[in-house]
Amino acid sequence: MANTVSAKKMTRKIAKRTAINRSRRSRMRTFMRKVEEAIASGDAANALAALRSAEPEIMRASQKGIVHKNTASRKVSRLAARVKALQA
């Protein structure tokens, strides 16, 4: 348990930041799940639309430090490849 005033404040700040990060991570995963569901249903147009909305969310999460830049790029790349294969 935090004893000093500054330690207590840091505990509050960490809790606040954790909640924000959890929300952003959840939002990113929701957008990715929409792409996955569109791919699973076989709807190429819907999958492409979902990918176009998911890509900025994933990259925004990387800019905010939720995921590493390379991880975000890898996720976008793999989703894009699956959507492209669906269109072919």
Curated annotation (Swiss-Prot):
GO MF: small ribosomal subunit rRNA binding; structural constituent of ribosome
Q: Tell me the domain of life.
A: Bacteria
InterPro entries in alphabetical order: Ribosomal_bS20 (IPR002583), Ribosomal_bS20_sf (IPR036510)
What biological-process GO terms show up in the record?
Answer: translation
Q: Which UniProt keywords apply?
A: Ribonucleoprotein, Ribosomal protein, RNA-binding, rRNA-binding
A Pfam family that this protein carries is Ribosomal_S20p
One cellular component term from this protein's GO annotations in UniProt:
small ribosomal subunit
Which residues constitute the signal peptide according to the record? none
Record-stated family: Belongs to the bacterial ribosomal protein bS20 family.
What does this protein do, in the record's words?
Binds directly to 16S ribosomal RNA.
| Name of the protein described by the UniProt record | Small ribosomal subunit protein bS20
Q: Which gene encodes it?
A: rpsT
